[in-house]
Design a protein with these regions (language model features):
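Glycosyltransferases and closely related glycan-assembly transferases
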Residues: 65-76, 136, 189-198
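Flexible loop/turn connectors
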Residues: 163-257
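Hinge/beta->alpha junction and helix N-cap segments in small-molecule ligand-binding domains
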Residues: 18-35, 55-59, 90-101, 117-165, ...
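Short helix-capping segments at alpha-helix termini
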Residues: 10-13, 138-145, 170-173, 195-200
Length: 257
């Protein structure tokens, strides 16, 4: 939102911005979550000229699909963040290059030879790109993917807890580094590791992605990739302005991380 507002002020635009957000993922009470998600039924889209959609934190796939279908029905231009969808304009960071750099850093500077990619949803746009970069590096290093697996789950903290708990309970050999698809999963792994007597980064290393506040203030501090959210917000406004001006806009656009 900060990036959106910055671009609006920079261009001195007369734009009214309305934000609809929910905390439907935060409770295990299904009825509570339904109530939270009801906020998406409030907007009268006939009063709007465009939509910026970020549903990366909506873990309920049926709810996510419901929102997407509703936006399709409006006929409005939609700029979607990290979501490939027919007729939407997708804006994304470079999910590929930073993982390549991170993997080489861990391999060359920290002598890591056993890896685990602690991923999110298998079909999520960002997760697919980051997992593909990870796989490329594993092959480049001459390692076997079955010995350096890719794990799939959600994008949340509890997924990281689950990954670590499974390693402990199944007495699996721990990797030199958990390459996490985001900082939430990294934090979950670190917390569960500490509960089981492990010390990060002494016993193994954990990396994140997104550069959330928790990466900076978490102990141990998590090595992470900076996701420039403000630039994404700024780019969303630029795309909508070009659409409103009748310009041709590519289906996908990228912002450097």
């Amino acid at each position: 939102v900060a990036g959106i507002m910055r671009e609006i002020r920079k261009r001195d635009l007369d734009i009214a911005l309305y934000q609809y957000n929910s905390y439907g993922n935060w409770s295990k009470d299904a009825l509570h979550n339904i109530g939270e998600y009801n906020i998406y039924n409030l907007p009268d889209f006939s009063e709007y000229d465009g939509v910026i959609l970020d549903c990366s934190n909506i873990s309920d796939q049926k709810q996510k699909r419901k929102i997407i279908n509703k936006l399709h029905e409006t006929g409005l231009p939609v700029v979607s963040i990290e979501l490939e969808e027919e007729e939407f304009h997708c804006i994304s960071i470079d999910n590929y290059g930073p993982i390549i750099e991170l993997m080489h850093h861990m391999y060359e500077k920290h002598d890591c030879r056993r890896f685990v990619f602690a991923g999110g949803p298998k079909n999520a746009f960002g997760n697919r790109r980051r997992a593909r970069a990870y796989k490329q590096c594993i092959e480049e290093f001459g390692l076997k993917l079955d010995e350096n697996p890719i794990l799939y789950g959600e994008y949340d903290y509890n997924t990281g807890v689950r990954y670590m708990r499974e390693f402990v309970e199944q007495k699996r050999k721990l990797p030199d580094v958990f390459v996490c698809v985001n900082d939430n999963i990294a934090a979950g792994i670190c917390t569960e590791a500490e509960k089981n007597g492990y010390q990060v980064p002494c016993d193994f290393k954990v990396t994140g992605f997104d550069n959330l506040d928790k990466a900076a203030f978490f102990r141990p501090q998590i090595t992470t990739v900076c996701l420039n959210r403000e630039e994404i917000g700024s780019a969303c406004v630029d795309i909508l302005m070009r659409i409103w001006n009748g310009e041709e806009v590519p289906a996908k656009s990228y912002v450097k991380s």
